[in-house]
Amino acid sequence: MKRIAFVFSTAPHGSASGREGLDALLATSALTEALGVFFISDGVFQLLPGQKPDAVLARDYIATFKLFDLYDIDQCWICAASLRERGLESVNFVVDATPLEPVALRRELGNYDVILRF
């Protein structure tokens, strides 16, 4: 079976992209275990705890990331450079994601047959 990477690169709540990506990821996890999840650029904001989306009349889907364990999604990486650029190096995110420098992240992403970006 093909290995599928889900790349989150947009901030939450500004568009439906993050929510749709998460829905697609959870649905795909029912079909295969060959999944990887990557958070790069503004996508690192998807994993911030304590968001208040109701203030901008958005749905709170961020808590759904906590279901990764239930869905056996354990291959999760976050861009270390993106964290530094945004001052988020010491944040406890809603999921355990392994920080990787951009070169290592691209190498890991290269191991996947299909890349879906949200």
UniProtKB/Swiss-Prot annotation:
Gene3D superfamilies cross-referenced by the UniProt entry: DsrEFH-like
Subcellular location: Cytoplasm
Any Gene Ontology CC annotation: cytoplasm
Biological processes, Gene Ontology terms: tRNA processing
Primary localization: cytoplasm
Alphabetized InterPro entries for the sequence: DsrEFH-like, Sulphur_relay_DsrE/F-like, Sulphur_relay_TusC, Sulphur_relay_TusC/DsrF
Assigned keywords, A-Z: Cytoplasm, tRNA processing
Pfam families recorded: DsrE
Function: Part of a sulfur-relay system required for 2-thiolation of 5-methylaminomethyl-2-thiouridine (mnm(5)s(2)U) at tRNA wobble positions.
Subunit structure comment from the entry: Heterohexamer, formed by a dimer of trimers. The hexameric TusBCD complex contains 2 copies each of TusB, TusC and TusD. The TusBCD complex interacts with TusE.
NCBIfam families: PRK00211.1, sulf_tusC_dsrF
Recorded family membership: Belongs to the DsrF/TusC family.
Protein name as annotated: Protein TusC
Native species: Salmonella gallinarum (strain 287/91 / NCTC 13346)
